[in-house]
């Protein structure tokens, strides 16, 4: 159970579902059961590897902030957690190789990014946020590469990455008091809350504008407009200095935008 817990299975399942969504909008999810199972499994394992190695590098911080986590609680040794994460990365990449070369290449690249993020990028301003946004967006792209890559999947990946980047910046704003107390090098700590809110808003506006370029029908346009309304409400909360409320609206908007893609594809 400890090996499963350190993978954070809920996050793994959500990532796997995102990859299947990318496959779905590429029009190949329902053609056979074999490839979707491989796609879901590869993403689940690589995400689990990323979560496990993240716990490995965060073990000293978790000993203070989250002593109940598997490593600081003593339920698994740091060495065992590291070996487990490497095994998950290898298994995920091997499965990706069974799909096609494009999926294997992306799996290898994302495994590398997950390792570098946990080891180096997490504590750097902007770089860590961009890494998380990239990983979120390419989860959808992975599913598309397993099928027949399309502009729709590319748009879904880009829009997801942009919305995630905005949300990551807002999360850092919300955590600013604690980060300043501990000397964390986040973007808001460098440029301040106001400029960070402006940047997060601009990123979200770019995402909203790009959403209308997606080559889907009027049903999609109507549905994505509702999602964009949620994003506008998020920006309004930013202008009011409400990071927590802004985050909630971004999450709602992302969910609505995903539904818009599915509606546009007549699911």
Curated annotation (Swiss-Prot):
Enzyme Commission number(s) of this protein: 2.5.1.42
Top-level division of the source organism's lineage: Archaea
Main location class: membrane
Gene Ontology BP annotations: glycerophospholipid biosynthetic process
Bridged cysteine pairs (disulfide): none
Taxonomic source organism: Methanothrix thermoacetophila (strain DSM 6194 / JCM 14653 / NBRC 101360 / PT) (Methanosaeta thermophila)
Family to which this protein belongs: Belongs to the UbiA prenyltransferase family. DGGGP synthase subfamily.
Protein name: Digeranylgeranylglyceryl phosphate synthase
Keyword Lipid metabolism applies: yes
Record keywords, A-Z: Cell membrane, Lipid biosynthesis, Lipid metabolism, Magnesium, Membrane, Phospholipid biosynthesis, Phospholipid metabolism, Transferase, Transmembrane, Transmembrane helix
Any one GO MF annotation of this record: magnesium ion binding
Its biological purpose: Prenyltransferase that catalyzes the transfer of the geranylgeranyl moiety of geranylgeranyl diphosphate (GGPP) to the C2 hydroxyl of (S)-3-O-geranylgeranylglyceryl phosphate (GGGP). This reaction is the second ether-bond-formation step in the biosynthesis of archaeal membrane lipids.
HAMAP family the UniProt entry points to: DGGGP_synth (MF_01286)
Reactions mediated catalytically: sn-3-O-(geranylgeranyl)glycerol 1-phosphate + (2E,6E,10E)-geranylgeranyl diphosphate = 2,3-bis-O-(geranylgeranyl)-sn-glycerol 1-phosphate + diphosphate
Bilayer-spanning residue ranges: 10-30, 33-53, 80-100, 104-121, 139-159, 198-218, 247-267
